[in-house]
Each structure stands twice: as structure tokens, then as C-alpha cells.
Amino acid sequence: MRNWLRKKIKSKLKDYKVAINTVDATLPKHITTQKKVAIVGGGIAGLSAAANLAERGFDVTLFEKNEYLGGKVGSWKFESKGETLQVEHGFHAFFRQYYNLRNFMKKIDVYKHLIPIDDYIIFYQNGKQQGFAGIDNTPGLNIFDLRKKGVLDFWTFINPMSMSFLKLLRYHPVKTFEKYDGVSFEQFAQQTAMPKHMRLVFNSFARAFFAEPHKMSLAELIKGLHFYFLSNDDGLIYDVLNDDFEHTFLKPTERFITQHGGKIQRNTAIDSIEYTDGKFIVQNDTFDYCILSLDVKHLKPLIQNSKGLEKYPLIQNNTNAIKCTDRYAVLRLWTDSFESNKTLPFFIFTDRLKCLDSVTFYHKMEKESAAWSATNNGGIFELHSYSLPDSLTKDEDIKQQLQDELFHYFPELKSMQIKHEFFQHRDDFPAFHLNQYKQRPTVQTEIPNLFFAGDWVKLPVPSMLMEAAYTSGAMASNFIFNKENLQENLLESVYGYGLLAKE
């Protein structure tokens, strides 16, 4: 019976992979006349656009405000007590359905650095653990199998209020947002009498998008669940890089861009651009195309300060409407101690007491961290709060609270000595809050040669986080290829409709 259902579900979901665009193989791939492209913002979206365009012969200049590339996957060195250490923006997971990003990683020969994580684990406040290894990976059947893990029970399936859970299987790229973008996950959980353990699991999932349950758009959550859990048979098991992002991803991407003639200007903050006579002026140079791939926090003032964009109300209104999400914090600790449970995966979610949402064990995951750990006989822990409460505003208070909650889950670490630390308190992640979707900008804009790219852009496919960032940059490149009568690059996605949705 299960095998029959698996086949039916796979067929309904188009074998879990569909093409986003149609490639005309009769068109040329490389441009033969000089066309200059300015890309502002060197995160994954900007790197994606730069790599795709430079490979085809475009004269690409990528402007990045920081010394390092990568944006939210950035990696850099810092000095502490006479040591030079590597740190990153924070932990990132490469899920198996990140089709476009992973294809690019294969192209630049960094796919080999991916290693699998064993389980998706949540630590509850009472000391119990929730894992997801062993459940059926087939969409729909995986929800039914949650009963094996105590997330659901028999009464959940026969409770009339639980019928509302079916909307999770009805993701629709238009109707879902029309109906549920103004409903919070908190409201949904209360209306459906969601079981406690299921709610804790969903709370952790919602916070992974840097939003509290009462602020998180139910439509965005349904899209996220569809993308990660209900559109493919890879389950929640994912891969991570086996060393820091600079060496395993960012340097190889930079080499790919520059080897194809692209230019990268670091430490170059672009505060404004000028649009005149159908072209863009950036840093006193003139460009045929411009891609804005900054984070939301820096995009909005750039749009407001730029000349020639004030005539375009959609650009002005839509960029003004999008928001940054709540403040978040990342604290990495180099210590003289280890967790006692050596069987844990590299990363765990925690049922926060006040602010701790996850712990990453870098000494188990990355080569450089493992080498430091072996030399210094201590673990490297990253503590992450995806959404800080309003009551925590001071850096020292946040750091102390994160450590206190770490000790709650790992009391054996209470006596640890901290040899080094690196703390980040930021507010630059895009909000997926209530009623944000309608005015969210798309890749194409009112100006035919201006494009947006980033994890904040509205895409025609249910893509999120790193995959959304990469895909948006690749889509911007494809639009430029199309304008120049060049062959597009094939892009792929999970199927854009839920198991019970009608097209």
C-alpha cells in the first residue's frame, strides 16, 4: 500500500522537480558585443548573478561594502588574544532540494565539501529530544509518520478541528497568500488546537525564518513547509560544508567570476545609483544593466537616495513596504570543554527558554574548527537566537542569557572557560511577517534593465533562504540573456503546488 502511495504522490508532485524556464538551445550562449552589468551586493544572490553573467562574456562589476564576500554566508578572520581565528555569519544548511545552488556548486567543484547531517533534532526544555530520522520521506506520509515520534497522535487525526491541517498540503502560489498572508501561525495553532509537541516543532520551524509565531505569516509558513517537507522525498535531512565558507564556497566562487573576466570591488559601499538615458551610473562608471542584490536594510536607503528612480512608483512603494525582521544574535565560543553526548549531530534546535534557538557544534563539523579543538582540547559552540525578545537589548545581557540557556541543555558545560568569543547582534534579515507578500518586489522591475535579487524577492516558485537567493540572481541573469537573445540557463524547482492543491 505504501509503495503504491509513494508512486502516486511522486507522480502528483511531478517527480519532485520541475523546470522553471524553457531553454532554447538554438540561441547562442555567449555575447559578442560589450555589455556592462553593475551588481550591487556580494551575497549569494549577487555572486549568482555575477558568475552566470561573467561566464557568458558580460563585463561584470560586483560591488560589495564589506571586506568579505557572501553576505549572510560571509566568512572572515579576526584576532583574539594573539590568535587568528575564522568566523562566519552563522550556521547554514544545504537542503537536498536546493537544486540550483547545488548545481552551481557542482559546476565550481565545491559540491565535494558537503557532508550529511544525521538527524534533525529538537531539544525540549524538559530534557527530552525530538528527532526525525526514520520517518517516511514521502510528502504526506511523512506527516502521518510524525505519530511515531510523538508529535501527533490518533486523536489528532480524528479531531474535527484538525481538518484545518489539510491546508498545509494545499499550497498554491496565489491562493495561499490571498487567504493566509494576513493570518499568523499563532492564530492558526490556536484555531486548530494544535498538539503541544507539534506546536513546538512548528515554532522552531517558524523561528528559522527569524520570526516569532505571532508575527510569522501563515502563508509564508505553508510555503516553507511545502518547500522543505511536503514537495520532495529528501526529508529534513540536509548537508553542511565541512570547512568554513571562505575556503569551501566563497573563494572558489570568486575565482570562477574573475577567471571569466568579472571584477569584484570590496570595501565599496554603494549609497546611490543614477538612472539616466536608459543606463546606470554606479561609482562614476556607466552600465547597460544593474542588479540590486543588497539586503533589505541597505536596499531601502539606496533606492531613496538614487537619482532617476523617483519616477517609478512601484519601485519606490514596494521597496519601502518590505521590512527587516526582528533582531537576532549569534555568539560563537571557543572553550576548554566538550558536550558529554558525543552522538549528537552538528546542529540542534532548542525549545527556547527566552532566546536560545539553536546550537552548532563547530568542532564536530568544520576541519579548521576540529583542528583548533584538537590542539586546545575544547569545543567550539555557536549559539543562535533567531528572534530576540524586546526585553533583551544590551549585548552583555544577550550573551549571558544565551550562555545560561546553553547550560540548561548542557549542564556539564557550566564550568567551561571561554578562550575566545565572537558576538553579532544584527537586524538585516528580511521579514516574512503578516501582510508583506503583496508588495514584495519581484526580480523584474518597472525599469527594463534594472533587476532585484535576494532572499527577500518574490519568486514564481516556492524557494526560500539560500536557494531563493541563488535562484533570484540566476533569474536576473536569465532575463538579461533573454534581452540579448542569448540562451538561458536551465533553472529547476520543486513543484509549485501542494499535494492536495489544484492548479
Predicted regions and their residues:
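Extreme N-terminal leader/targeting segments of oxidoreductases
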Residues: 1-37, 55-56, 496, 500-503
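N-terminal Rossmann-like FAD-binding beta1-loop-alpha1 element of flavoenzymes
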Residues: 33-62
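Flavin (FAD/FMN) cofactor-binding core of flavoprotein oxidoreductases
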Residues: 209-210, 400-445, 498
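Mid-domain catalytic core of redox enzymes
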Residues: 4-19, 268-381, 386-391, 409
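Active-site/ligand-binding neighborhood in enzyme catalytic cores
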Residues: 32, 165-272, 276, 286
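Mobile amphipathic helical/loop "lid" adjacent to a hydrophobic cofactor/ligand pocket
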Residues: 4, 101-102, 106-107, 111-219, ...
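Glycine-rich FAD pyrophosphate-binding loop
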Residues: 55-79
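FAD-binding beta-loop-beta segment adjacent to the flavin cofactor pocket
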Residues: 370-375, 426-452, 456-460
